[in-house]
Amino acid sequence: MTFYDHTAIEPKWQAFWADNHTFKTGTDASKPKFYALDMFPYPSGAGLHVGHPEGYTATDILSRFKRAQGHNVLHPMGWDAFGLPAEQYAMDTGNDPAEFTAENIANFKRQINALGFSYDWDREVNTTDPNYYKWTQWIFTKLYEKGLAYEAEVPVNWVEELGTAIANEEVLPDGTSERGGYPVVRKPMRQWMLKITAYAERLLEDLEEVDWPESIKDMQRNWIDKSTGANVTFKVKDTDKDFTVFTTRPDTLFGATYAVLAPEHALVDAITTADQAEAVADYKRQASLKSDLARTDLAKEKTGVWTGSYAINPVNGNEMPVWIADYVLASYGTGAIMAVPAHDERDWEFAKQFNLDIIPVLEGGNVEEAAFTEDGLHINSDFLDGLDKASAIAKMVEWLEAEGVGNEKVTYRLRDWLFSRQRYWGEPIPIIHWEDGTSTAVPESELPLVLPVTKDIRPSGTGESPLANVTDWLEVTREDGVKGRRETNTMPQWAGSSWYYLRYIDPHNTEKLADEELLKQWLPVDIYVGGAEHAVLHLLYARFWHKVLYDLGVVPTKEPFQKLFNQGMILGTSYRDSRGALVATDKVEKRDGSFFHVETGEELEQAPAKMSKSLKNVVNPDDVVEQYGADTLRVYEMFMGPLDASIAWSEEGLEGSRKFLDRVYRLITTKEITEENSGALDKVYNETVKAVTEQVDQMKFNTAIAQLMVFVNAANKEDKLFSDYAKGFVQLIAPFAPHLGEELWQALTASGESISYVPWPSYDESKLVENDVEIVVQIKGKVKAKLVVAKDLSREELQEVALANEKVQAEIAGKDIIKVIAVPNKLVNIVIK
């Protein structure tokens, strides 16, 4: 049996593509464009795992398909290479993070090239390259000039073990850090913030303009979380102080019986009475040790302390005790709430715990038993009595505005973006702080502000980054003799990834971020493929920066990514015991088709789980490529199931894909190829071209491969294969298995040219219809012959053909024909005597 040798074929074609720059981005202005983007990887020390190529293969198939359809294709790759792991490694080993990063990139690139992806490597970007981050810094200076980058003293999520503050989005629900799982504490620090809130409405509205999964749009909507309501001002009794509360339900103001301030609220110390001072100070200290997520957990026990003061309810003059409680966040809304315990579960639990008044203002429910959180007509509400929710809200807002104690207000849960990190391995923030108290941005002519090379990259211990230790870089003097210090915080890893798709368009431009005409030509990105875990952060940040650049006239589109697709997760094979605990694969043995624990002998259940080092079920693509070939890996990952489904890795599935490719190889290299078309494969070939074309366009790669298999099965039943169909089939399979595609193309054409730009095959609509039908001929009710005849023959023609058939003539010889019944396209029934 003939098998193809992937170890010879694949490196040969990879070298051919590299030497000939086969995938250099097309620039023919008369052609349509297609920009296929992968989420670029962080080059970790572990290298690629088999999950990476799933998305990369999908965009590669699309890119190869679009090239063959006559598009200019931009399909680039680069490296999101700043970040904590490299710095952590450098601190652990004493090595330079830049060297570690360069080694990792070289390894990733080797692995990616071994998989046959058609990237234009002339456009490679690396976020740690000063020629790249010059423009990351330039964008920051523009944000600063527009007032969108500002410094603030804010309570941050401080991680002592990492020596840095992290964004809210990087804190896990259990209150630990996403990276490392370390404790997170709240600590006030001077930080750089980006005013993403200024774009909240546009970030919300423009989701309507993009073709993204609805689930991802919903995650962004929920993160931005727009609320319409009212601001209400409460005076503090016996003082000149007041505070503002934002509420979405101003209609329930008559039911507000107490107020709660965040422990960090600026008013707390000023209104706390001497009797309560110690308890309040103690509570504030405890709250500072908790993350926002831990504080707002609905299931946790309610805690709080009374300040000793009262606020006055503006609508009825009632006194409301003012408490502090950690479930109110200083960073959300105004950092103060009015509590309506009759109609809010959290307020109700708090009121019950601390014996506070509960006054119902909506009809329905028993508020002694539980909060009534549904809608009802208003009661105990003076001028709102008898009104429904919408009417009551409108009337209360009107009253608040007339009395000068409130106004209608739209708010968003979205917070400004905490942009500074107290780390070394990141882009320096291009700001200088002068001793006269002013700050200025580093002028564009002095960018990039290069990260200095230093051995001393441990956290400074002061809360500043290690750059505070590099004095010759840190200290500067102006022409007028005024001394200054450079900003020591660096940018987060999100910075470089918020605009990299723009740099691919013009990666070597030294004068500007990218040429306007090229940006006009290529934007927006046509398809962006990556994991759903980036749904909120990266995608929201990139959209924000893109909108700022749109306002600056740098980019021509409002949105960066027209279509987004999230590939599913490739799960590892794993095993569970009777308690449901996962067992590492090296502790499992297979006997008679069942799986057993090596040490205990217990029978185990096979169950897919996320690949992890601890379960020893991580599959390295290098091993797969070596054993089966890159084309097999590509075809297998696309054939596993729908691209957006999470599916378990299977060695059997891999073997099946390899066998299919061997059959393809044998079909083209051993079957007699003829210039004459017998017509036997007309229908299946044209069906295959039509189906594969449509399914690749819709990213239904698994069904496209299934159709290719249908063609191979049909072709194998024939003695010969029509040359045009052989070539067309090889073109169809080439985007999936590009090395094999090139090899078979040369076997058929000996052209010496790559298959990559050969025009995509078209199909003949008329051949999709069956022109012939099989009919049965019955004599005395028994089938005596089956005939293939032209479709839609008339009764008379059908009768003629049937009676002329040799088998039929033998049956009716010497007999009298009483009647012939012909049913077009079905049967002929002959009655004889």
Curated annotation (Swiss-Prot):
Main location: cytoplasm
Subcellular location: Cytoplasm
Binding site residues for ATP: K613
Reaction(s) this enzyme catalyzes, per UniProt: tRNA(Leu) + L-leucine + ATP = L-leucyl-tRNA(Leu) + AMP + diphosphate
UniProt short sequence motif 'KMSKS' region, positions renumbered to this chain: 610-614
CDD domains membership: Anticodon_Ia_Leu_BEm, LeuRS_core
Keywords of the record: Aminoacyl-tRNA synthetase, ATP-binding, Cytoplasm, Ligase, Nucleotide-binding, Protein biosynthesis
Organism domain of life: Bacteria
Keyword hit for Nucleotide-binding: yes
Family: Belongs to the class-I aminoacyl-tRNA synthetase family.
Name of the protein described by the UniProt record: Leucine--tRNA ligase
Organism of provenance: Streptococcus pyogenes serotype M4 (strain MGAS10750)
